[in-house]
Amino acid sequence: MSLHRAHWQRSDQPILSAMTTDQAWCQVQLYNPTVVRVGCTYKMWYLGNSSETRRPEMNLGLAESTDGVHWTEHSDNPILHGSDLPFGSAWQTPHVLFDVDENLYKMWFIMLTGRKDGQGRLVDMAQKLGYAVSPDGLQWDVHPEPIYPSGRRPCVIKDGPKAYRMWMNSSPTPDGAFEDLVGNIYRFESTDGLSWTRDPQPVVTANEKLRSVVYPFVVEDESGYTMWYGSHVDGGVFEIFCSTSTDGLTWTHHHDEPAFPATRNPNDFDGRYTSTPCVLDDGDRYLLYYCARDWGNLYRAGDGTIKFDGAGVYRHIGVAVCPKAAI
């Protein structure tokens, strides 16, 4: 069996949740895990806020684990705020790589700014790629300006001292709409991780069944490449699909069924959305980290009022396990 057909063993409960955390900064939204393992320690960076949904406000937190399944939130969270960004007001979709050659954590992320109408609805936003480095994953030196003008959810692989590849959502045109951004995944190349060249054509595009293709994550193994990404499908559901490639350039899309579906169960934390996949190759197993939406629409906002979000709320992070022997 190929990795894109892996049988994932998911937990009944999230590993982190805005509904159960004791930390005050992420009690409304909790979103987009990115995980690395260095030695015997697993580190997870993730996003959160305690104001309300649909706002360009999101900070960055850190959690650690010794087994990849049970996590402890860092006491100094959030470790980075919107005020630490050189552009915009919200952290979005980080991706962290530990560079073993330089003994350095490197993070690519999106910086978001938004504009609302008179009813408080987000009607326009700009999303630009940023970069930061850290010796320990806690204290970060943020690059002082955006490094690419259009993006969402970068995923970076380092092939050598001067060879980086990235897959990221990007708008085909400089003035493209948000729907264009989340409907196209491109491949990029760089010699330093800062200056990026985008391929002329996207490698994955939205279609009639998958109305978006967003949050790409790529794993390379002996058989080639597997890319996971999230998609809006019928029924108000968002699920993780896959494509595979032998060279990272030409992809075969496996859209007949999701690689990691929402359960559709109204009682499950991941009943409505499975999103922002992050797959860790961890010895004799793979770990799939993801954020999730349940079917609830109500939440308590930061001002104490009860608010309604018709699309649900990103408020859980889950993990699923697949032993390599089962693939």
Residues of each region from the PLM?
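Carbohydrate-active catalytic/glycan-binding domains of CAZyme proteins
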Residues: M1-I327
